[in-house]
């Protein structure tokens, strides 16, 4: 209603829900405006009744409405999904999606947030972007970040992509998922060329959220997650393991006729399953170590609060995120007032501010920080060389410890131990008495950017300058270093019932004794090689103009980076990059990119290099002959594109490769009497190679983007082929004679070819009853082949690495079983433990035909441990407040090596790996394991090589979102309640 010059109205979305914070401004005069309140209402004073208002909101189509003469009028804004997708983040800038001719895929923070219960961005990316391959090797709290490759592996030195957060090289772990606006993955040469020596393995651009003009919007999210081990080996219990041991001993009687004495009587074996009393239960243990060590589930929590909004002068986004990851290991009472085990807590804070200093000047400030607090048993940190061993001791119960060797803890409080084999550990004791240590990682990142519109010089010209400073500080070894475990350790001999106590021996007195309890409280120390600092500054010019149907853009950038770890000499990089694009009528596209890069990792002669790329595109759907299909909404968009270029990589493992290096050799003297004429001497530890330079990769890419039937079907097809040259081969991997005297020089001698394709299909359908169903499906195939790696020239072809994939598995090839002693005698003999072979062993192929099975007969088998094919399918629906989706992820063409050996070290650990061979003609799954005898390592054949293919139900969710009624009365725009699960089911071979 218009009373004099006052206008009242309400802003709604297409579902009839009110919109909070919508912008309402007078057309032609942005100084007259307001925003809608919590109920979507607004009041605005306008000059006259003929005024026109522009109503807008992020992610929706803006509306122009004329002021009505009476009554409260309503403005309905519709979702603008095309608007949300029309801008793609590219290297050092943004481009309209329609004009992108490079291989770039993008997802949003909203998509990543579907993976509730996952706090790591890398893990959340799994399956959501074609071409991105993730491999997670650890579930330790705080160590869940997966290894990421883009389009597979192309170098044995380094295949990690460059990760940039808001334009600066930073780990993705420094950002919480709720703060992510978008993630772009740059895959081909045209997309990555502006990064020069840093872009050979692809680039991941993480863009964080920023504020928009309007009322403050507060978002609160919280979830609790229960985690259980996904898959553990199936071990036989004591009864079945001892029965299996008797079978194995009988099988070996021809080698050891006196081994009858090792066979357990059935009456004794029965006691392991059905002990008569506590004494028998302790003498004849039957321990399910997995049940002892692990909780039924571990709890993890994640909570986030963020607020965004702003005025014409300042726009803001601020976020606080908390993560807690619980421990699967159970808690044991150790009587020492501390609990060992694992855990991780992290707090992330972020504030992004945009100041509109003048109409043409914007000053941006990003300040972020994180504090990660990781708890482990003492020395079980990934920064310590003993970590792998210590962690293995704690997991040994789940994998290796026999169920009958001892109890974790006896009724008198003594810990179980095994005196006959020193490396048999009590995992429960290790978890309980492992001490406790905290590793605190503090990260602070700051960005200051000034953006200036220079249209007063020439239309479309702008400049940007930025400086950033990051600091990472790590403190570890704060906690309890448990030096001596509990004094009471015992073992009960099941054959005699005799109790043995663990004792130590004093060399000075000759007495043995039981150690007492002792530990140190450690105050912590700075981890020098994990403390990092990074200084980066950039200056950039951009120009964008349209001349009729001719659209031109230019970008030029200078960047310098200084990084240092601990007290080392800083690393330096310098980049001069440019990009130029041209398109005619948004139909024909040309792009050329380049970068002149410098790195101090190489000699002055090789310190700088120029890398460039070009791309072309054709928007077929904009051609006049496609008008018939477009008008009938059969074809929405069809674009064909191609790119080619050369990119570099300076991410070599070692510095100073171009210099001769010397190391301390020792002291000596010039006389018989070492006190006279002493001197110190040094040795040449590494021979330098002044010609060491960048690894280079030439990338060729063809792509098709399509959309049909008004967006019902959309997607893309990519075909790529890369050739990487000048790959560094380390001195220890080179073929040189032993009399050279030291390692050979590291040199650029390697070549690898990578090829593959990507398929993506998106389905989106909204029905008349407002039900929406959608599906995103993708597949990536990426394979590589080593062309050269300085193999010894006289090696047989199958013994070389050239001709096979990086990481190609090799095995001794088996061809069925030895079914009789005639087979044993008539088969190729082994050069070690040949006399120990028996019927039931594998028939190992003499691959090189020299009559003997030895180390030279190991041949390529299966694939590498990086999958060639990855698949993703996400299906969902939305109707009114209800929503649900499921996501499946799968891989194939991958080989895993999992060596679980039954009866290892004569322990009664037996794995359920299928049926054993027992006589000729059996359809056996594996050979009959040994208990006493030893076979050569060749005899395992391919037993421990598995097809690593799997299909996983990676994510599933059912939810309901409240948007009106009681929710609005609480001042809440919407409230979502959901049940979500991750890695719920897996099928594997």
Model-found features: residue ranges?
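C-terminal extracellular loops and terminal segments
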Residues: 122-128, 744-753, 794-810, 860-876, ...
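Conserved small-residue
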Residues: 219-281, 379-380, 384-387, 655, ...
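Extracytoplasmic gating/loop element in the C-terminal half of outer-membrane beta-barrel translocons
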Residues: 258-261, 425, 429-430, 836, ...
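Glycine-rich, aromatic-lined ligand/substrate-binding cores of catalytic
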Residues: 459, 864-897
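Extracellular/periplasmic, surface-exposed regions of secreted and cell-surface proteins
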Residues: 160, 352-359, 367-371, 396, ...
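Flexible loop and strand-edge segments within Gram-negative outer membrane beta-barrel domains
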Residues: 224, 229-233, 281-321, 325-331, ...
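C-terminal beta-signal and terminal closure region of outer-membrane beta-barrel proteins
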Residues: 746-754, 796-827, 913-927, 934-940, ...
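Short, small/polar-rich motifs associated with maturation and membrane association
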Residues: 4-349, 363-364, 775
